[in-house]
Design a protein with these regions (language model features):
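Flexible, solvent-exposed loop/hinge segments and secondary-structure transition points
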Residues: 2-122, 126-155
C-alpha cells in the first residue's frame, strides 16, 4: 500500500484521539443548548440526546440528555409517548446501522421505530450520535442537525 501525501502519512502515524470526558461534556452542553434554541425556533418541545461512541463499532457510549419542555407527550396516542424512550430508540437504531435514524433501508428491529429525527457523524475516533423526539420527523431532524453541527465544530 502506498500513501500519496504527507497528510495521509501523518494521519496514519497519529490516529485521532478519543474525546475525553471533559471535552465530551463541554461539547454536549453546547449541543444541547443549540438543540433547545432550534426547538424553540420551530415551536416544538421534547427530548434531546447527544452521545459519543469511541471506535469503529458502537460497543459503548457516553451520553447527555435534556428535556426541552416535555419528557412525555400524553396526548400523542391513547397511551401517550415517552419522548426520552423514542429519542434513545433513534440513537439505538443509529448505533446498529451507523446511519441516520429512519434511513437505513432495512426494517426496524424490535425496540426501534425506523423514525427519522436522529443524525450521526463519523469522527476520526468514533461516532457522534444526536437525536431529538417531540416534533414531526422533519423538525426533529433539524433540531438534531443543530446539535450535531455544534459538536462537529468543537472537535
Amino acid at each position: 500500500m502506498s500513501l500519496a501525501s504527507g497528510a495521509d502519512v501523518a494521519w496514519a502515524a497519529n490516529p485521532a484521539k478519543p474525546l475525553s470526558d471533559k471535552k465530551f461534556d463541554t461539547l454536549a452542553a453546547a449541543a444541547l443548548e443549540a438543540m433547545k434554541q432550534k426547538a424553540a425556533e420551530l415551536n416544538i418541545q421534547g427530548v434531546a440526546v447527544v452521545s459519543y461512541a469511541e471506535g469503529d463499532n458502537v460497543l459503548g457510549w457516553s451520553s447527555k440528555m435534556a428535556v426541552v419542555g416535555h419528557l412525555t407527550d400524553p396526548k400523542a396516542s391513547a397511551s401517550g409517548n415517552n419522548l426520552l424512550g423514542i429519542a434513545y430508540a433513534k440513537s439505538a437504531e443509529m448505533a446498529r446501522t451507523l446511519k441516520d435514524s429512519g434511513t437505513s433501508g432495512t426494517a426496524p428491529m424490535t425496540g426501534e421505530f425506523g423514525w427519522q429525527g436522529g443524525v450521526m457523524f463519523k469522527t476520526g475516533s468514533g461516532y457522534l450520535i444526536v437525536a431529538f423526539s417531540g416534533g414531526k420527523s422533519e423538525d426533529d431532524v433539524q433540531v438534531s442537525k443543530a446539535g450535531l453541527e455544534v459538536m462537529k465544530k468543537g472537535l
